[in-house]
Regions:
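Short, surface-exposed secondary-structure boundary micro-motifs
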Residues: 19-21, 122, 168, 181
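Catalytic histidine site
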Residues: 1-45
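Short, solvent-exposed secondary-structure boundary/capping segments
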Residues: 10-12, 79-86, 142-152
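Active-site region of chymotrypsin-like
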Residues: 90-102, 127-211
Length: 244
């Protein structure tokens, strides 16, 4: 889901949020020999990923799609992590046609069970499919992380897409989370997907992940890209021992 696409210093910055398990094959940890430490160390290798954009007539009829290269700029693994990834699109000349409106962080308390929700994703590899439901549960924890549940039907392929909620006050659909998991019912040697019990990463966690990785400019116009880049660079600098 495109969450930011703006021009800064003659260069367009477009960012996409997805699940880590969607792009996990492009994240590799390899053992490399370190000539200074005289031992093998883990080295991260991030392959290029592709983001597919769709074109529509009258907002509803798919007339084509195109893929654009992107870089993985932040992530949290699915195993024991938060199953989240942030991508930066390499096209630095063209803004994205559509950018999701993020649900305001200071309005989270006004999200309730029975609120209508809408899931959008590439269900079973299909071009984006929309489904309608409601927020049905807001207190589940998986691997110690909070998930919300929606009855908007989702299936394999929805991961990394979006869940939206209509804001009556702001008169727009707003991004409230990332479809990430679906419930399954074991049936002998197989399992049935319970499509109306889909778990999604709630928007409050999305905000926290962006903050932890210093990408606050995506949701807060008072914070600049330059400030975030400086903070991220400082965080990545090797820490000096206090005794030095």
């Amino acid at each position: 889901t495109v969450v930011y696409s703006e021009k800064h210093k003659d260069e367009v910055h477009t960012y996409v949020i997805t699940n880590h398990h969607v792009i996990s094959d492009s994240v590799k940890i390899e053992k490399k020999w370190d000539s200074v430490l005289k031992r093998k160390v883990d080295k991260e290798k991030l392959d290029t990923v592709f983001v597919e954009f769709f074109r529509y007539n009258n907002y509803s009829h798919t007339v084509g799609s195109f893929a654009v290269e992107a870089d993985i700029v932040a992530y949290s693994e699915v195993e024991g992590g938060q199953d989240w990834a942030l991508l930066r699109v390499r096209d630095k000349e063209n803004k994205a046609d559509w950018v999701a409106n993020m649900f305001p962080l200071d309005d989270i308390e006004n999200v309730h069970i029975f609120d209508k929700s809408y899931a959008v994703g590439a269900s079973l590899g299909h071009p984006p499919v929309a489904s309608e439901g409601m927020i049905t549960y807001m207190d589940d924890e998986i691997d110690s992380y909070k998930y919300w549940m929606s009855s908007a039907p989702t299936i394999f392929g929805n991961s990394g897409g979006a869940v939206y909620r209509w804001s009556i006050a702001r008169k727009r659909y707003e991004y409230i989370g990332i479809p990430s998991r679906i419930s399954i019912q074991p049936m002998g040697f197989s399992a049935d997907a319970i499509t109306h019990m889909g778990y999604f990463i709630p928007i409050e966690r999305v905000y926290k992940l962006l903050e932890e990785n210093n990408y606050q400019f995506i949701y807060d116009e008072k914070i600049s890209i330059d400030d975030c880049n400086k903070a991220r660079k400082k965080k990545q600098e090797p820490k000096k021992d206090e005794d030095e």
